[in-house]
């Protein structure tokens, strides 16, 4: 049976005198200078720490941490007035019929490196009705769903489920009312029925719908690129409070190779549906960027 060298406690990871426990070949097989560099990098970038603990100290990790800080994601810039956009690349999250659903449209202007995001959210009307019947002043999930509905940022669907057809209707609204045509729409193939997919294809064309497989192979690099664009304030989402809530709720899970994917926190009330919809759209945008930009 192979013997695994590891630290006695994860707290020893930044104590050079303890490193020999997990690295008996330190100084020969692995240079101390290399380990010092990796530890310092982890101190400067906490998201890198789980990688160091696993690869250099053999400490098992479930590497999960916040994807964006509030400083990263906060952007109060508003969208330009109507008529600024002609095409968009869409994405939507429809994973749960009895909960929050979201759709996004990435728009862009010629000569402008910012991405402008249009969005819509849906929730079952029963969620709000139950709250009113209970006289509960604290809204479910601790956020003001009723206010967001009254502000037009979110829509309700009658009953206890979201009829996912409303997502198609919203993209049709963009086309018919705002003259913004969806060039492509990204979707998770696990969470769309054949019937709804056929309806999208009938409305916009078979080639418009693009599968976005979930997991690190598809999402890792786009997540890293999108994070950088948020940090550079190149993602303009009209200061939408639901977007901010979903973004701040999003955590990233990192494997030992540094690949990342989005995950929900352990708290059920912390929704990330808006982030999931944006990522689906952004993955397609990255793959279709040249074609998209040639049309704007």
Model-identified regions with their sequence ranges:
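Acidic, metal-ligating active-site segments
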Residues: 97-111, 274-281
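Short glycine-rich phosphate-binding loop at a beta-alpha junction
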Residues: 179-190
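Metal-dependent DNA phosphodiester-chemistry modules and their immediately adjacent helices/loops
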Residues: 1-21, 203-289
């Amino acid at each position: 049976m192979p013997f695994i060298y590891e630290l006695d406690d994860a707290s020893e990871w930044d104590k050079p005198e303890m490193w020999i426990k997990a690295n008996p070949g330190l100084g020969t097989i692995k240079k101390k200078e290399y380990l010092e560099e990796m530890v310092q990098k982890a101190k400067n970038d906490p998201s890198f720490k789980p990688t160091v603990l696993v690869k250099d100290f053999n400490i098992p990790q479930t590497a999960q941490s916040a994807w964006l800080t509030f400083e990263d994601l906060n952007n109060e810039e508003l969208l330009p007035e109507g008529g600024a956009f002609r095409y968009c690349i869409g994405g939507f999250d429809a994973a749960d019929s009895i909960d929050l659903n979201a759709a996004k449209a990435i728009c862009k202007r010629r000569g402008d490196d910012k991405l402008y995001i249009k969005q819509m959210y849906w929730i079952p009307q029963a969620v709000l009705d139950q709250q009113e019947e209970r006289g509960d002043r604290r809204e479910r999930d601790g956020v003001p769903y009723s206010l967001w509905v009254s502000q037009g940022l979110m829509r309700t669907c009658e009953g206890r489920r979201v009829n996912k057809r409303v997502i198609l209707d919203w993209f049709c609204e963009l086309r018919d009312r705002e003259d913004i045509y969806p060039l492509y729409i990204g979707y998770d193939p696990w969470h769309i029925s054949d019937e709804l997919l056929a309806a999208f294809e009938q409305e916009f064309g078979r080639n418009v719908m693009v599968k976005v497989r979930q997991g690190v192979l598809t999402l890792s690099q786009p997540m890293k690129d999108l994070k950088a664009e948020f940090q550079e304030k190149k993602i303009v989402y009209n200061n939408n409070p639901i977007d901010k809530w979903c973004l701040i709720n999003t955590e990233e899970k990192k494997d030992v190779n540094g690949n990342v994917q989005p995950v929900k926190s352990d708290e059920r009330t912390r929704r990330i549906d808006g982030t999931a919809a944006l990522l689906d759209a952004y993955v397609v945008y990255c793959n279709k960027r040249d074609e998209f930009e040639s049309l704007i």
